[in-house]
């Protein structure tokens, strides 16, 4: 049975967007857990789920040095740093609106296209540049009322905005590197390897931040 991915693709993106939206709501309920623990377990669970398909395609686990490099960048930025920054921004909802965090995070297509131009040699139109500028300006005014940064809460509002923007940068830039890795490999293999690498990296971050006690005891 032939699957027309051009027709199905947009619907899969819509489903993914819905899941990401739910992810943010569920993530807030895990406020008692360190962000590194959340990152570790979400990727460990994902790895366990995708493992059967990964082992089925184990013969295809041959990557060039550049592909391994791209996967490592994706794992570090998208898997670890992006999720850490996004979670940190959500924790600061006392200083910045929950919806603003999501809106800033949605700027990632701008970063995705920027890196696609640099690394994938894709071309963009002047119209795209115009709308990208409009999006950045809109994001600024959505974040800071009347265009003025309020320091009544110290610098926490600015920090929260920067964390959300950092997540957009991490996830957006990783999109281009993911695309590079997918040029010659199946999405199942690339996704499986990404989850594997991110799980290991997240565990390393857990020990770097001295939060290993929370691995088995969330209240630690």
Per-segment meaning from a language model:
Residues 25-33, 90-97, 143-157, 206-220:
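Membrane-interface helix termini and inter-helical loops of multi-pass transporters
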Residues 7-15, 37-52, 69, 73, ...:
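Hydrophobic alpha-helical transmembrane segments of multi-pass integral membrane proteins
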Residues 22-24, 57-99, 105, 141, ...:
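Specific transmembrane alpha-helical segments of multi-pass solute transporters/efflux pumps
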Residues 21, 25, 75-80, 84, ...:
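Hydrophobic/small/kink-forming positions within alpha-helical transmembrane segments
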């Amino acid at each position: 049975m032939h699957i027309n991915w051009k027709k199905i693709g947009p619907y899969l993106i819509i489903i993914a967007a819905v899941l990401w939206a739910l992810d943010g709501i569920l993530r807030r309920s895990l406020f008692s857990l360190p962000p590194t623990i959340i990152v570790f377990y979400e990727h460990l669970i994902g790895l366990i789920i995708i493992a059967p398909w990964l082992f089925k395609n184990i013969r295809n686990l041959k990557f060039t040095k550049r592909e391994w490099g791209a996967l490592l960048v994706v794992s570090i930025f998208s898997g670890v740093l992006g999720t850490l920054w996004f979670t940190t921004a959500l924790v600061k909802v006392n200083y910045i609106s929950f919806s603003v965090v999501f809106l800033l995070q949605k700027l990632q297509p701008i970063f995705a296209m920027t890196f696609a131009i640099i690394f994938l040699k894709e071309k963009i139109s002047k119209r795209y540049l115009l709308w990208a500028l409009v999006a950045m300006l809109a994001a600024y005014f959505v974040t800071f009322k009347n265009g003025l940064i309020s320091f009544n809460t110290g610098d926490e509002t600015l920090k929260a905005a920067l964390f959300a923007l950092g997540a957009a940068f991490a996830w957006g830039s990783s999109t281009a590197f993911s695309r590079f890795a997918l040029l010659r490999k199946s999405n199942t293999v690339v996704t499986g390897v990404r989850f594997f690498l991110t799980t290991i990296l997240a565990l390393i971050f857990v020990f770097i931040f001295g939060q290993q006690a929370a691995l088995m005891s969330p209240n630690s």
